[in-house]
Regions:
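Conserved GTP-binding G-domain of TRAFAC-class P-loop NTPases and closely related GTPase folds
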Residues: 2-8, 13, 87-142
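Conserved substrate/cofactor phosphate-moiety recognition/catalytic segment
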Residues: 10-59
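Conserved beta-strand scaffold positions in the cores of enzyme catalytic domains, especially
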Residues: 27-31, 76-78, 121-124
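Acidic/His-rich, divalent-metal-binding segments that scaffold phosphate/diphosphate chemistry
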Residues: 132-211, 215-216
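Divalent metal-dependent catalytic cores for phosphoryl transfer on phosphate-bearing substrates
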Residues: 185-292
């Protein structure tokens, strides 16, 4: 059997260091380009690590489909590097050729992987994975408790009473998430969905951009991907399983695709394959999201 480990991580995330250590311990060959990857996988019983950002979901899906068509005995694992975003940006700032704008653009484009992309296995590589936070998904919280107990995490706390400054949203970011959490708790006892509602916009705190034009709406480009990445970091400290973390983050990252799934016939089959059996849950989360403005 051929084995491939695809690392998914940001610049300065420590993925190359982790890959080198893993390769030595488990006898893998590290490659960094598609050409090298295909050449190594041509060898029977090959064990290959693909050390690249691999951050864009559509590119991952295309590559996995290509590789599985070519190598029937290929087992593909995804190793997602969950590294604190503050740490990543601080490491970049220390470089002589620092380009923080580039790194932030990569952050906004990076999607957390999911099994539906074609992976046979997924691993979360988190450097502080131990229970340091309580889980509040099954406990009714007041807004004050929600802010204190959930949104106090670094970077996530930037959403507290952050105004949306646009024509679509009346509530602040933190209140929007809180009301979504309250409403979905009345409709389901699915703890992963409730957790997703609690955290679904936490990336808006660092993606908000305003214009010199006082009449222009603020923008939050990339906030869905950033919210998913921050949710992983938060959930790693809740002591729950990787399967639960990936499911919660899947809801956060994909509920906005429901409109496209319902309204774009050309995308329906593609999205059905990606969203799988979670379509109804994603619909519920998006309904709640749209109901609280």
């Amino acid at each position: 059997m051929r084995k491939l480990i695809m690392y998914i991580g940001l610049p300065n995330s420590g993925k190359s260091t982790h890959a080198e250590t893993f390769a030595k311990e488990h006898n893998y060959v590290i490659v960094k380009t598609n050409e090298e990857l295909l050449r190594e996988l041509d060898k029977e019983e090959s064990r290959v690590i693909f050390d690249s950002y691999n951050n864009v979901r559509s590119n991952r899906i295309k590559l996995i489909e290509l590789l599985k068509d070519k190598f029937e005995d290929l087992f593909i694992s995804g190793f997602y590097m969950a590294t604190d975003l503050d740490t990543i940006l601080k490491r970049e700032a220390k470089k002589e050729d620092a380009n923080e704008d580039f790194v932030f653009e990569v952050i906004k484009k990076t999607s957390v992987p999911h099994m539906n992309e074609g992976f046979d296995n997924l691993e979360l590589i988190g450097f502080d994975r131990f229970k340091t936070r309580e889980i509040y998904f099954d406990k009714p919280l007041s807004y004050q408790d929600y802010v204190k107990k959930v949104l106090s995490y670094p970077i996530i706390n930037k959403t507290i009473e952050l105004p949306h400054d646009n024509h679509d949203n009346v509530f602040s970011v933190s209140r929007h998430m809180f009301y979504a959490y309250q409403n979905i708790s009345k409709l389901t006892d699915n703890k992963q969905l409730i957790a997703a509602a609690m955290l679904h916009d936490v990336g808006k705190g660092i993606t908000k951009r305003t214009s010199d034009n006082v009449y222009a709406d603020a923008t939050f480009d990339g906030h869905v991907n950033v919210s998913a990445q921050l949710a992983v970091l938060y959930l790693l400290n809740c002591g729950i399983s990787k399967e639960e973390i990936f499911k919660i983050v899947f809801y956060i990252q994909n509920h906005i695709l429901i409109k496209e799934y319902e309204n774009n016939p050309n995308k329906k089959n593609e999205l059905e394959k990606l969203l799988g059996s979670e379509i109804q849950n994603l619909k519920l989360l998006e309904i709640v999201n749209q109901s609280v403005k």
